[in-house]
Amino acid sequence: MHDIRLIREDPAAFDAAIARRGAESASSRLLALDERRRAIATELQAAQTRRNEASKAIGQAKAQKDEATASALMAEVAALKERMPALEAEGAEVEAALDAALAAIPNLPAADVPDGADEQDNAEQHRWGTPPAFAFEAREHADFAGPLGLDFEAAAAISGARFAVLKGGIARLQRALGAFMLDRQTAAGFTEVIPPLLVRDEAVFGTGQLPKFAEDLFRTTDGRWLIPTAEVSLTNLVREQIVAEAELPMKMTALTPCFRSEAGAAGRDTRGLIRQHQFEKVELVAITTPEQSDAVHEAMTKAAEAILEALGLPYRRVLLCTGDMGFTARKTFDLEVWLPGQGCYREISSVSNCGDFQARRMNARYRPAGESKGTRFVHTLNGSGLAVGRTLVAVLENYQQADGSVTIPEALVPYMGGIAELRPA
């Protein structure tokens, strides 16, 4: 959500910023609604004031036996009482239209975000690790993980496409990955949370998935939404809250199932675990002040990178361009892991600084130190630390052996009960 006051102050700058996101000029439409809203509010306030004055004057006129004046004032009060509900209704309608228009516009990009249309225009920041060299032709995980316990056919029979059943060693490996990630992130200062998986409209609106991306979500018959990411539940913990500056930054992590319809991804990544309707992810969320925001963003990104490095998985960090960023983000770093079977880097984490965009939608504020009354909107940040299923894919492909077995990364062996290798059944 955007601050209409800032748009009033510099409409040209606002239009220039959203143009970088590929959005059409909006300031004229927004300011017209804002002007009408304020005019109605002014007229309503004047009507209320005049009604009170006239009501008081009626008593005075009657006390003076001036029935003509009293009658005229009574007629005026009656007209005002009839007019005011119409003004209130019109004001509510205009305000709703303004709020809806503001809610449909993406966040403004930070100054250092590169302009661009899509992922081809993203800016690589750095790389870590060297892609493994195999003495055999590397395969995609879907081509060799079946004998390890990965079963797409059984899942399809139960649930349809884009689901998987994991059994035996590969199921244990996924569980180990999630536990390993949680342990690392809590050691990095994130508080573990077990949040709800079903949320209300207000929660999904607050983090920006509604109303624009409803088709990408699953909704229950009673009107709740399955979370597409724990970002929704964690970030909404501060909705309608005022926290003390001393409590910031608040850093939270959660391992949850996530659910996405992938309506906009038809035909993409139809094989394997890369794009599923149901998957597990360790989410990182931070609530902080504007002054700390950039530093927290960097620290969160490094916390995600540390998982990849501990697992020995080659990756690169890219700064997303304006055309590839998510709706709520003002700046996003993607971490892309090397997948030998595909011969390319694929996204495994996206860490975003949303500024006060989500906070305005949620009315999430903090009270600066030393102030007893004033409040400011918090900044919210979120990222994957990491996507468990995609990390499983990366481990399978980077540690695959010619005989179809998979070596367990050293850091995971304790989480596997000492098992150092997965072998085909």
UniProtKB/Swiss-Prot annotation:
A cellular component annotation (GO) from this entry: cytoplasm
Subunit structure, interactors included: Homodimer. The tRNA molecule binds across the dimer.
Function: Catalyzes the attachment of serine to tRNA(Ser). Is also able to aminoacylate tRNA(Sec) with serine, to form the misacylated tRNA L-seryl-tRNA(Sec), which will be further converted into selenocysteinyl-tRNA(Sec).
PROSITE patterns referenced in this protein's UniProt entry, alphabetically: AA_TRNA_LIGASE_II (PS50862)
Compartment(s) where it occurs, according to its Swiss-Prot or TrEMBL record: Cytoplasm
Catalytic activity: tRNA(Ser) + L-serine + ATP = L-seryl-tRNA(Ser) + AMP + diphosphate + H(+); tRNA(Sec) + L-serine + ATP = L-seryl-tRNA(Sec) + AMP + diphosphate + H(+)
Chain residues that bind ATP: 260-262, 347-350
Coiled coil (residue ranges): none
Protein name per its UniProtKB record: Serine--tRNA ligase
Entry similarity comment: Belongs to the class-II aminoacyl-tRNA synthetase family. Type-1 seryl-tRNA synthetase subfamily.
EC number: 6.1.1.11
Binding positions for L-serine per the UniProt entry: 229-231, 283, 384
Gene3D superfamilies attached to this UniProt entry: Bira Bifunctional Protein, Domain 2, Serine-tRNA synthetase, tRNA binding domain
Record-level Gene Ontology MF annotations: ATP binding; serine-tRNA ligase activity
Swiss-Prot/TrEMBL keywords: Aminoacyl-tRNA synthetase, ATP-binding, Cytoplasm, Ligase, Nucleotide-binding, Protein biosynthesis
Chain's gene name: serS
Species assigned in the record: Rhizorhabdus wittichii (strain DSM 6014 / CCUG 31198 / JCM 15750 / NBRC 105917 / EY 4224 / RW1) (Sphingomonas wittichii)
Domain notes: Consists of two distinct domains, a catalytic core and a N-terminal extension that is involved in tRNA binding.
UniProt record, GO biological process: selenocysteine biosynthetic process; seryl-tRNA aminoacylation
Top-level EC class as recorded in UniProt: ligase
CDD domains attached to this UniProt entry: SerRS_core
Pfam families: Seryl_tRNA_N, tRNA-synt_2b
Pathway: Aminoacyl-tRNA biosynthesis; selenocysteinyl-tRNA(Sec) biosynthesis; L-seryl-tRNA(Sec) from L-serine and tRNA(Sec): step 1/1
